[in-house]
Amino acid sequence: MTTEILKVDPLGTTRLVSTGDGAFVERDTRTAHATLGWLARRLAAREAAALAALAGEAGVPRLLAFDGLVVRRSFLPGKPLYETPPRSRAYFVDALRLLRRLHRTGVAHNDLAKEANWLVTNEDACAIIDFQLATRARVRTAKFRRRAYEDLRHLLKHKRTYQPNCLTARQLRVLARPTWATRAWRALAKPPYRFVTRVVLGWPERAGPLERRG
């Protein structure tokens, strides 16, 4: 068995563990900063709950174990979207289908603005990772629909970056209509969020686990 550290930050350590039976990723909150342990455990619980709800879905990690401190999930081979732009139009078609499946299951990801959370697999298909901020809803409340809408807008922003000519008229209208929550986020929450992630945690804007090593 071999272990590779993918990320170390005040919220814990993320490792890639390779065994004779395959590989898995574990997020270990036991190494979190003493003042942030509660937050690290809460985020780990969110990820575990979301992955449990998505059991059996293709294109997302499979939850292997969670003991309240360490989350283990299957490893999905692939490259972040910003490293390996998709070669075919089918990628964003696949991405939209995957996102709809998440939402039908009652899971909103809430962190899809980061290209590092979108993978391009070896088959040029879409996969989504990092469900720490995900939320679940048994009923499609207005809040859930708003979060799902923002997930969709983030996907379409990436499509606009890499395949702008493939956007439909309806998708362009979605891009032109941010929710009030998005406008409030940009005005009030985004500046302190960027300070925490870039200054306190030292994450580059597009950082994925490999770039966040301490």
Regions found by a protein language model. Give the residues of each.
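ATP-binding glycine-rich loop module of kinase domains
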Residues: T2-A52
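Conserved hydrophobic "DFG−1" position in protein kinase catalytic cores
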Residues: L16-T19, A65, S74-F75, L119-V120
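Conserved structural core of kinase catalytic domains
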Residues: R30, A40-A45, A49-L98
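A short acidic, helix-capping loop that chelates divalent metal ions and anchors anionic groups
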Residues: H33-G37, Y82, A137-V139
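Hydrophobic core positions within the conserved protein kinase catalytic domain
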Residues: L51, L99-H103, A116
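Catalytic-loop of the protein kinase fold
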Residues: R104-T121
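C-lobe/activation-segment region of protein kinase-like
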Residues: N122-G214
